[in-house]
UniProtKB/Swiss-Prot annotation:
One Gene Ontology term, aspect cellular component: host cell nucleus
Protein name: Protein P7
Gene: Segment-8
Function recorded in the entry: May play a role in inhibition of the host immune system by counteracting the type I interferon response.
Alphabetized UniProt keyword annotations: Host nucleus, Host-virus interaction, Inhibition of host innate immune response by virus, Viral immunoevasion
Highest taxon listed in the record's lineage: Viruses
Subcellular compartments: Host nucleus
Biological process per Gene Ontology, one example term: symbiont-mediated suppression of host innate immune response
């Protein structure tokens, strides 16, 4: 597994210098870190805007894919808050405990400041799903403003389209509007 370089702190510092109002700052090669003081720490390079499917612990370490758990995309902002973030954090913490047997698998606020997630639709309410989509669309505009690579934008747009298609039938109007906007 190749290492991401430079380090996350350097990326954040560089991005903040370039942007006067860094509400959302994307950085290339950010390390997604899951783990904590238990000694279990998994670092995985996440290219800018790329959707990463987190699977079983061993396969995450080996960079392989087998069991779908959740989808994460990397952004630089305040640690997640609200019901969706709590659900995501608890889900990952429990998942790490199950896979490793560790008693404490909390990644800590500093690490969560680099990770923002979207849980699969069956774990989220319609309003939360639409809010997540709004966040992703806002991120897309931010990436354009920051001059992100076309590949990074393409990856994020694919994630947005996939999320739109997962909306329930009750959101048919929103689906139509969002898909029309993305064309």
């Amino acid at each position: 597994m190749r290492e991401a370089n430079p380090k996350p702190r350097e990326l954040i510092r560089h991005a903040l210098k370039k942007k006067k109002r860094p509400e959302v700052v994307y950085a290339m090669g950010v390390l997604l870190t899951l783990g904590g003081e238990s000694g279990l720490t998994v670092e995985f390079p996440v290219p800018e805007g790329k959707t990463v499917k987190v699977k079983t612990l061993n396969q995450l370490v080996n960079g392989m894919i087998s069991r779908a758990t959740m989808t994460l995309y990397c952004v630089m902002k305040d640690p997640p808050s609200g019901g969706m973030a709590t659900l995501m954090r608890d889900h990952i913490r429990n998942w790490l405990k199950e896979e490793s047997g560790c008693q404490d698998a909390d990644g800590g606020e500093e690490k969560w400041a680099m990770v923002y997630g979207m849980i699969s639709p069956d774990m989220a309410e319609e309003k939360t799903m639409l809010k997540e989509l709004k966040t992703m669309l806002h991120s897309r505009m931010q990436m354009y403003a920051l001059g992100a690579s076309s590949k990074a934008l393409e990856n994020l747009e694919k994630a947005i389209v996939a999320a739109v298609h997962r909306l329930p039938a009750s959101c048919s109007t929103e689906k139509m509007v969002l898909l029309g906007y993305l064309k």
